Amino acid sequence: MSAPPKENIGLPVSEFVQMNNLACESVGGKVLFATDDCFAPAENLLKKKDPEFKPGLFTEFGKWMDGWETRRKRIPGHDWCIIELGVPGIIHGFEADTRFFTGNYAPRISVQAACLKPEEITFQPRKDKIGTAASIEEYKSADKLKSEKWSHLLQMTELTPGYAESSHSYFNVNSKQRWTHLRLNIYPDGGIARFKVYGIGQRDWSSCKPNDLEDLLSMVNGGVCLGFSDAHYGHPRNLIGIGRACDMGDGWETARRLDRPPVLKADSKGILQVPGFEWAVLKLGHPGLVTHIEIDTNHFKGNSPNSCKIDACALTPTEEEGVKRDERFEIGYNWKPLLSVTQIHPHKRRYVESTSLALHQVISHVKITIAPDGGVSRIRLWGFPRPLP
């Protein structure tokens, strides 16, 4: 069990942890600078996979740890690193995971942020840094950014040791600005296993021409998961990830439904006649007119759904604010069919052209329903950005 969430002003933890991890290595997040990487490099902070512990495994510098761990500080100051977000955007919360760092965790952290231009970054690529501290040249590159003056998104606050019942600490952020880089400060030294940055990607849509075809649902373009019925094996936010899924864990997968019939039957089109289904609701990065859809079950060879349908609606931000507290996303959502019930197949991409779509108007939200259960790796909604009517 996680430690009780630490909340401030902003979204509750239960909402922001459904959002995208803007700093994950799988979406391009990377560490540009770290004061020290003695026991374990800062790059481990951004790994997508959960941290692991290997008893008895040591490097030439000390115990092998799956996280960022600095040396015991014996000089003035504290340790910190600079992280470049893989997807710039609006940040709603942080998660600091100290798992397995029990007697060596960082007792306090703070987080600062900046919105930088590419030409402001002058760091050389980091190589294998274990056992080292930052060089004079690396400090010079860091000093140019004046990161100590960046905006504080999280003031200094305490973490908890990396035991199973206390390793996760959550912090919400009340900021509407777009950020590209973070400075993670640890006080004074120690280790953190993972650092997640929950938020919504934000791109400059003003540069997009009316006839530019875009994936309106992609996390890079600001798509975000708002809710779902089940995420037993994989979260539906993975549906809008970058590129094709790397494995089954990089998709949305539900548990097997217990209400499925003892003997399955199908109609003449091969659609299973089952009572149950699973769903996920997502918000497009920009309202738009969808022209074709891609449903990808890559890697799901024995556990893909039998069928999928997609409903859509158009909501202004004010309307969305008024209805989003309905946990089933039914009250206040005027759902209309976008894609009727369609059979899908294991480990394949299914393309649906415009002529097969049931709705040809601007939409802002979609509800993806699969039956009876199973896994989908990606959903792409290709179309043209348009303002809401």
From Swiss-Prot:
Keywords: Hydrolase, Purine metabolism
Domain of life: Eukaryota
High-level lineage: Eukaryota, Metazoa, Chordata, Craniata, Vertebrata
Example GO molecular function: allantoicase activity
Pfam families reported for this sequence: Allantoicase (PF03561)
Cited NCBIfam families: allantoicase (TIGR02961)
Entry EC number(s): 3.5.3.4
PANTHER family documented for this protein: ALLANTOICASE, INACTIVE ALLANTOICASE-RELATED
Entry annotated with the keyword Hydrolase: yes
Pathway: Nitrogen metabolism; (S)-allantoin degradation; (S)-ureidoglycolate from allantoate (aminidohydrolase route): step 1/1
Catalysed reaction equations from the record: allantoate + H2O = (S)-ureidoglycolate + urea
Cited function: Utilization of purines as secondary nitrogen sources, when primary sources are limiting.
Family: Belongs to the allantoicase family.
SUPFAM superfamilies in UniProt: Galactose-binding domain-like
Protein name: Allantoicase
Any one Gene Ontology BP term: purine nucleobase metabolic process
Name of encoding gene: allc
